[in-house]
């Protein structure tokens, strides 16, 4: 994958565990969505799963190259704290990925986990786990305030890029 010697990918989820249950028993049975600290993962019927199924059917990836892990709230919180102790400030979603990776790694293996959100988006979680004032909101984001959904550019944001519509 991407020219890297990747043995497997881990589909890490929070308590909304439809994919891991399906991977284990072959039954696609979405349950009611459970609110969690990693709220962007609060999806009980992920609409991107058919893409994975298609890649499997085409032989692009093999079943043995995909693992699944469910990370509960306590483990997510532990991940935030552990990563902080390692000098990395993580938000809950990356902490889910980190804890899943820690469980899956075999002796002698190395791994990579990915996260895309900034910890400042989760002030309640960060303060509860690491204390007040740990996460600094970048000045440019604090000054900008919330974005609208109409594609307007921020005032003063003249960097030559076009606004994106959502």
Q: Which role does the model predict for each range below?
A:
Residues 1-166:
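PLP-dependent amino-acid enzyme catalytic core
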């Amino acid at each position: 994958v991407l020219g890297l010697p990747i043995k497997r990918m881990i589909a890490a989820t929070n308590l909304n565990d439809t994919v891991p249950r399906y991977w284990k028993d072959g039954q696609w049975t979405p349950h009611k969505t459970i609110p969690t600290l990693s709220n962007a993962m609060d999806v009980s019927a992920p609409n991107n799963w058919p893409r994975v199924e298609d890649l499997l059917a085409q032989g692009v990836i093999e079943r043995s190259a995909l693992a699944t892990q469910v990370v509960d709230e306590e483990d997510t919180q532990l991940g935030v704290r552990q990563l902080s102790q390692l000098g990395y400030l993580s938000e809950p979603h990356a902490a889910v990925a980190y804890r899943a990776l820690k469980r899956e790694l075999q002796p002698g293996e190395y791994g990579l986990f990915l996260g895309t959100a900034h910890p400042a988006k989760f002030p309640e979680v960060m303060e509860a786990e690491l204390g007040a004032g740990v996460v600094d909101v970048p000045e440019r984001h604090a000054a900008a305030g919330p974005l609208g959904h109409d594609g307007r550019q921020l005032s003063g944001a003249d960097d030559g890029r076009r606004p994106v519509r959502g």
